[in-house]
């Protein structure tokens, strides 16, 4: 990225909340996105402890900047150091198991990060010639996802779900499976969510073994946080910081990465706040006029290249459940698959609570996943949809009033519903059930046998919380024997 040839320091001329105006000597104005540093005694005692990023040029000598931390304590006339480069974050194996903030500083009280390499957070998307054009699915080992809403390797997945339906557990299982089966790492970008949730996630990852506190090099995940209480500048940039960490593992270490962003809506929201602070005229519903551009710059960097892939799972908050709101609507345009978590499934104890009828995937196509996978997935969905249609009749008249065919459909649908549940490795300390990773061919075969009626004689509880179909058969034998 180009930088001003004459790197000279400036002075603060104005502070309005998180916006700081800095005046430079003539001919030394830093480029847009350049990181500047100020010593702010209002934050802590360290030198150069506040990073501000150039956002606009006002006149010939003044840069309008957005602060990445609190501006309390700044006064006019304070010296500002021009770093001559954009915000850069540490990358590589040394950041595994650590919690970083938007500028790459550790916030987990475990000492400095020993990384030798840093990368700027503002980077171009990979060239078209570097992209991997092969469309292939990303096996997660989770039956309901692999069968009905498969993830695209290097794709973007929207994760929808309210509070307490299992988003975090699903995420941790994905982190665990990617590490164990693919040797890949994961990066979690906490964008504008609650600090308590970030802290809980860190401790849950330690308990689940995803982060090894005693030997960080054995950890499988990096956490990059810009939480709700932080200024809009930090929340608008932290997703880029997390993505940069993931890009290094993809491009230099040739790994398959999983990037989790929670929550992509807060990225847009922070961008809207920054836009208003910079005095831009708002667009629809008060959002920034550059909404699609900002989203595109982030999403286009998340892709599959010849070296590796970044597959991204993004939690999406839908304001007032309005799917036409510009923020979620802009995110939808980039998604390859959606995983919808349904509270009704948690109420009947089906975990993961992924809705098999609401979740979708662009690659559930016979040309990509194969004819057998597609046919089995559609048969499963048809059976479940028929069961859903019959539920009103069952509630009013009871099962006895159904035709024989419908009774059979209901019995198979209930078995399918239970077979879509699965014990997770990261939850085994709570459930006592060892976690199961189910290979895709086993998943397809298991559901095909249920749909074809091969297991009509087995009790439905035999299919609950098992891995492959063989386990269900074994469980049925134990149930009948017991």
UniProtKB/Swiss-Prot annotation:
<keyword id="KW-0067">ATP-binding</keyword>
<dbReference type="GO" id="GO:0005524">
    <property type="term" value="F:ATP binding"/>
</dbReference>
<keyword id="KW-0375">Hydrogen ion transport</keyword>
<dbReference type="Pfam" id="PF22919">
    <property type="entry name" value="ATP-synt_VA_C"/>
</dbReference>
<dbReference type="InterPro" id="IPR027417">
    <property type="entry name" value="P-loop_NTPase"/>
</dbReference>
<dbReference type="InterPro" id="IPR000194">
    <property type="entry name" value="ATPase_F1/V1/A1_a/bsu_nucl-bd"/>
</dbReference>
<dbReference type="Pfam" id="PF02874">
    <property type="entry name" value="ATP-synt_ab_N"/>
</dbReference>
<keyword id="KW-0547">Nucleotide-binding</keyword>
<keyword id="KW-0997">Cell inner membrane</keyword>
<dbReference type="GO" id="GO:0016887">
    <property type="term" value="F:ATP hydrolysis activity"/>
</dbReference>
<dbReference type="InterPro" id="IPR050053">
    <property type="entry name" value="ATPase_alpha/beta_chains"/>
</dbReference>
<feature type="binding site">
    <location>
        <begin position="161"/>
        <end position="168"/>
    </location>
    <ligand>
        <name>ATP</name>
    </ligand>
</feature>
<dbReference type="InterPro" id="IPR055190">
    <property type="entry name" value="ATP-synt_VA_C"/>
</dbReference>
<keyword id="KW-0472">Membrane</keyword>
<dbReference type="InterPro" id="IPR005722">
    <property type="entry name" value="ATP_synth_F1_bsu"/>
</dbReference>
<keyword id="KW-0813">Transport</keyword>
<dbReference type="GO" id="GO:0046933">
    <property type="term" value="F:proton-transporting ATP synthase activity, rotational mechanism"/>
</dbReference>
<dbReference type="GO" id="GO:0045259">
    <property type="term" value="C:proton-transporting ATP synthase complex"/>
</dbReference>
<comment type="similarity">
    <text>Belongs to the ATPase alpha/beta chains family.</text>
</comment>
<dbReference type="Pfam" id="PF00006">
    <property type="entry name" value="ATP-synt_ab"/>
</dbReference>
<keyword id="KW-0406">Ion transport</keyword>
<protein>
    <recommendedName>
        <fullName>ATP synthase subunit beta</fullName>
        <ecNumber>7.1.2.2</ecNumber>
    </recommendedName>
</protein>
<dbReference type="InterPro" id="IPR004100">
    <property type="entry name" value="ATPase_F1/V1/A1_a/bsu_N"/>
</dbReference>
<comment type="subunit">
    <text>F-type ATPases have 2 components, CF(1) - the catalytic core - and CF(0) - the membrane proton channel. CF(1) has five subunits: alpha(3), beta(3), gamma(1), delta(1), epsilon(1). CF(0) has three main subunits: a(1), b(2) and c(9-12). The alpha and beta chains form an alternating ring which encloses part of the gamma chain. CF(1) is attached to CF(0) by a central stalk formed by the gamma and epsilon chains, while a peripheral stalk is formed by the delta and b chains.</text>
</comment>
<dbReference type="InterPro" id="IPR024034">
    <property type="entry name" value="ATPase_F1/V1_b/a_C"/>
</dbReference>
<dbReference type="GO" id="GO:0005886">
    <property type="term" value="C:plasma membrane"/>
</dbReference>
<dbReference type="InterPro" id="IPR020003">
    <property type="entry name" value="ATPase_a/bsu_AS"/>
</dbReference>
<keyword id="KW-0066">ATP synthesis</keyword>
<dbReference type="InterPro" id="IPR036121">
    <property type="entry name" value="ATPase_F1/V1/A1_a/bsu_N_sf"/>
</dbReference>
<keyword id="KW-0139">CF(1)</keyword>
<dbReference type="InterPro" id="IPR003593">
    <property type="entry name" value="AAA+_ATPase"/>
</dbReference>
<comment type="function">
    <text>Produces ATP from ADP in the presence of a proton gradient across the membrane. The catalytic sites are hosted primarily by the beta subunits.</text>
</comment>
<keyword id="KW-1278">Translocase</keyword>
<keyword id="KW-1003">Cell membrane</keyword>
